[in-house]
Amino acid sequence: MEVSRIGSFQEHIDKTTGIVTPHPLLRKPLMSQPRGIYLITPDETDTARLIARTAPLLNGIVWLQYRNKLANTALRTEQAQALLALCRQTGIPLLINDDLELAQTIGADGVHLGMHDSNPSIARAQLGPHAIIGVSCYNQIERAKQAIKAGASYVGFGTFYPSHTKTTPYRATPELLRQTTHLGVPRVAIGGLTPKNIAPIIEAGAELLAVISGIYSAKNPVTALKAYQSQFNI
């Protein structure tokens, strides 16, 4: 094993497998009631620009998810590692979208799984008891229940409004959130969310709002983030 430093923390790297084992301080138990903005990165091919766009936003969010549907494996690894170093400096957990192998390799704090990705139980076994594992559940309560049984830390519902980024045939409603208060894990709302339309979503019980373009594509992303936060009274 050899030791490398990411941010101000040590991590152990297995020379044979290349798998990173985070220092225990890096993976903490999921906060009991996370509430606020769950920021998801855009499809950005310039790593330096991605970091520059993301850094000013970290102090105002709960979690960061790395998502880039256009990048190849090498670029995804480069960007994920750069974001992880940034997140280590601020204490914000970094999750990887749809790539359990990448999450494990770089020692990310968790992974978000879609419909055709790995089972949450596999992710839990590979990433450990404190990893944050999320599952897209669209508008399906039964899928959410099964995901939680399999080890999911949170479930995502959406889309709530039309979205250019998150295109699915599924449409979720505030009523769905009211029907899932018993699930016992945070519920993430996603899809076309803006500061002007999120009040009903928050009132219905969503603990977290997943946002991409509403913040990154705004004229002033920091101001946009504050507008979202104001709806949570945070």
Swiss-Prot record:
Chain positions recorded as Mg(2+) binding sites: 98, 117
The enzyme's E.C. designation: 2.5.1.3
Binding site for 4-amino-2-methyl-5-(diphosphooxymethyl)pyrimidine: 65-69, 97, 136, 166
Pathway entry: Cofactor biosynthesis; thiamine diphosphate biosynthesis; thiamine phosphate from 4-amino-2-methyl-5-diphosphomethylpyrimidine and 4-methyl-5-(2-phosphoethyl)-thiazole: step 1/1
Binding site for 2-[(2R,5Z)-2-carboxy-4-methylthiazol-5(2H)-ylidene]ethyl phosphate: 163-165, 192, 212-213
Cofactor: Mg(2+)
Cofactor comment: Binds 1 Mg(2+) ion per subunit.
Signal peptide bounds: none
Reactions catalysed: 2-[(2R,5Z)-2-carboxy-4-methylthiazol-5(2H)-ylidene]ethyl phosphate + 4-amino-2-methyl-5-(diphosphooxymethyl)pyrimidine + 2 H(+) = thiamine phosphate + CO2 + diphosphate; 2-(2-carboxy-4-methylthiazol-5-yl)ethyl phosphate + 4-amino-2-methyl-5-(diphosphooxymethyl)pyrimidine + 2 H(+) = thiamine phosphate + CO2 + diphosphate; 4-methyl-5-(2-phosphooxyethyl)-thiazole + 4-amino-2-methyl-5-(diphosphooxymethyl)pyrimidine + H(+) = thiamine phosphate + diphosphate
Protein name: Thiamine-phosphate synthase
Source species: Xylella fastidiosa (strain 9a5c)
